[in-house]
Amino acid sequence: MIEQTAQALADGKAIGWFQGRMEFGPRSLGGRSILGDPRSEKMQKTLNLKVKYRESFRPFAPSVLREDVSEWFEADYDSPYMLLVDDVKKDKRIKMTKEEESLFGIDKLNIKRSEIPAITHVDYSARIQTVHKKTNPKYHALIAKFKEKTGCSVVVNTSFNVRGEPIVCTPEDAFRCF
């Protein structure tokens, strides 16, 4: 399952990830998540419009292997509950031209700002979830396999629900949602 799911993510597909017990609260932390490839310039818009049925500009959060967080973000600390925000590492950013810097609003949002554009906000920040092998072994294994295939130890992670609905609880909910 890990191999096939990591390959589907690497191929640009959005995945409904359902494992173990359901999280309680507003964030999906790898138990009930919709996942995508953060390297894709189209993933943010695709997930928002075709999966979540919400405005195309709404940002997504990254799940990153704890041992690799400082490779992708200015952070080097634990954030297992997706509560902390930090900037994408400077060497992962793409410098904007003067013309791009002068853009405003939705036009600025459509500019690729980093190697992981699907989770990079306009100010280069992201709300990070660090994934630990000991506390979330299956999700960690998935991200590690994705890294093996792509060189990227980050995935897009958003709650497994559509606008106005609660996060899925049962397998039946998951099939109905996705």
Describe the role of every protein-language-model region.
Residues 1-178:
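Flexible beta->alpha loop and helix N-cap segments adjacent to enzyme active/binding sites
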